[in-house]
Amino acid sequence: MIDPFQRLARRGLFLFDPETAHGMSIAALKSGLVPACQIAPDPRLRQTIAGLTFENPLGMAAGYDKNAEVPEALLKLGFGFTEIGTVTPKPQSGNPRPRIFRLVEDEAVINRLGFNNEGHEAAFRRLAELTGTGIFGVNIGANKDSEDRIADYVAGIRRFHSVARYFTANISSPNTPGLRDLQARESLAALLSAVLAVRDEMAEKSGRKIPVFLKIAPDLTEEGMDDIAAEALAHPLDGLIVSNTTLSRDGLKDQRQAKEAGGLSGVPLFEKSTAVLARMRKRVGPDLPIIGVGGVSSAETALEKIRAGADLVQLYSCMVYEGPGLPGTIVRGLSALLDREKAGSIRALRDSRLDYWAARKV
């Protein structure tokens, strides 16, 4: 439940257009105006996934801190990890404004940002200055005008290898024309081969092998899911992130804003993304890590992602509506749910509703 102070702050931010409000929230985190969340560590929430130890399973998804401006401040809100980006080799301005739209009745957001970011060098400089031991992932993408998109992903691995705790290859944004074509099997095989080869090359030189995750779309056919699963298992990929935003507008109340082009995120994405998550878990088996994203708005929805097959979960859009207290509320709520379930660990509940979600309509 959003507290009165956060409700007032949200009302103030909602007086501004979404992109301006986003910039104001980044500025507030930079300045220390947002209070840190005090959460007692719960060893039942701690997991080691892809060689990394996460104090709790909740992460901030990519898209909020595009330029690595506030990763440590985000961890202080209660997140167990955070993901910066998407970053591209060269700076780019993205698509014309307006390009973010609130669907308040639906607690959803439509964006067509188009990988607006300051480029590799700006993000690298900021990450190199961090002194903490938190888990910061780097979400890498390709420039819109790139003549060799796979080379852009390879460049991201090379540039951030010394500062990233994990990588995410984002091939599923709907806002860069042709990007989702990299999910097609032949293209995906070429991408994974190139990215993982340079990751292994850098590991030999540095002694640090950085996990690589692949972020996929929710708008996949069954054949598309088959192909991605097959290639994920055929390469030494460290995990999947399921899922990015959707092009679907099914069931929305705000039909005026629903007409805007772009990817939909927030509460309406929960069902679809969770069903795709479960289908992918069925396809890749029990061992490949999966991070579940899409519509996480509470401890209950976070746990439901885990029951559907996720090891970790991420959120972003729902914090637009619930405020910066949401991560702490969810983490405390997960501990309470483990008490209720009499579960010794969060891992013990993974896959407990896998069959239910895998059978749901996508």
Curated annotation (Swiss-Prot):
It holds the Pfam family DHO_dh. It is an enzyme of class 1 (oxidoreductase). CDD domains: DHOD_2_like. Pathway: Pyrimidine metabolism; UMP biosynthesis via de novo pathway; orotate from (S)-dihydroorotate (quinone route): step 1/1. It is found in: Cell membrane. GO terms for cellular component: cytoplasm; plasma membrane. Keywords: Cell membrane, Flavoprotein, FMN, Membrane, Oxidoreductase, Pyrimidine biosynthesis. Catalyzes the conversion of dihydroorotate to orotate with quinone as electron acceptor. One of its GO terms (molecular function) is dihydroorotate dehydrogenase (quinone) activity. Its cofactor is FMN. It comes from Rhizobium etli (strain ATCC 51251 / DSM 11541 / JCM 21823 / NBRC 15573 / CFN 42). The active site is at residue 173. InterPro entries: Aldolase_TIM, DHO_dehydrogenase, Dihydroorotate_DH_2, Dihydroorotate_DH_cat, Dihydroorotate_DH_CS. FMN binds at residues 62-66, 86, 139, 170, 215, 243, 266, 295, 316-317. Its main location: membrane. Substrate binds at residues 66, 111-115, 170, 175, 244-245. Its EC number is 1.3.5.2. It comes from the Bacteria. This is Dihydroorotate dehydrogenase (quinone). Binds 1 FMN per subunit.
